[in-house]
Design a protein with these regions (language model features):
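Catalytic phosphate/metal-binding cores of nucleic-acid and nucleotide-processing enzymes, i.e., regions
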Residues: 1-161
Length: 161
C-alpha cells in the first residue's frame, strides 16, 4: 500500500474580525454571552468556508500550519490569537468531521506565521496529512456504535438482592 502526503488549504478572508478576536482572547474580559456569540460566529464561518471550499475530510495525524494576515503592522501577542480564534476554528473543523479529533494523537499545530499586507485580514490553514478520506470511507454511526441490545446492560440482573 502506498502512503501519499496530501496537502489541503483553507483560506478565510476578512477573518478574524477585531471584536471577535478580542472577545475570544484569554486576556479579554467580556460577558459570557458575548463570548458565546463570538465563538458561535467563528464556528459558523469556519464550517461554511470549509464546506464551500470543499475541504477534504482528514483522518490520521494532521499537521496544521496557520498563517494570520493583518492589515496594519503593530506589536501583536500571537499566543492570544492561537488560544482564542484558532482553538475555536479547529473545534469547528472537528464538529464538522473534517478532522477526527483535536487531541495530540490526531493534530500537530505548528507555530503560527504572521504576515502584514495593507487592506488584507485573513486566516489561512494549511493541512498536511497522509490519510484523506471520502464520505464513503467514513463509518456510519450505526456501524461504529454499540448494538442496542448491549446498551445499558449489566452483567448482573437488576433488582434487590
Amino acid at each position: 500500500m502506498e502512503c501519499r502526503v496530501t496537502t489541503a488549504r483553507l483560506e478565510i478572508s476578512d477573518f478574524p474580525r477585531p471584536a471577535v478576536a478580542r472577545s475570544l482572547s484569554p486576556n479579554g474580559r467580556v460577558h459570557w454571552a458575548q463570548k458565546h456569540l463570538a465563538r458561535t460566529a467563528v464556528h459558523q464561518r469556519v464550517w461554511l468556508e470549509a464546506f464551500i471550499q470543499q475541504l477534504p475530510k482528514m483522518r490520521g495525524l494532521v499537521v496544521i500550519r496557520p498563517t494570520f494576515t493583518y492589515p496594519i503592522e503593530r506589536r501583536r501577542d500571537i499566543d492570544n490569537a492561537c488560544t482564542g480564534v484558532l482553538k475555536h476554528a479547529i473545534d469547528a473543523l472537528v464538529r464538522g468531521a473534517w478532522l477526527v479529533d483535536d487531541s495530540l494523537e490526531y493534530v500537530r499545530l505548528e507555530p503560527p506565521v504572521v504576515c502584514v499586507k495593507p487592506g488584507v485580514r485573513s486566516l489561512v490553514l494549511e493541512f498536511e496529512t497522509s490519510d484523506v478520506v471520502t464520505d464513503r470511507q467514513l463509518p456510519s454511526v450505526a456501524e461504529s456504535s454499540v448494538p442496542a441490545a448491549q446498551v445499558g446492560s449489566t452483567s448482573q440482573p437488576r433488582g434487590r438482592r
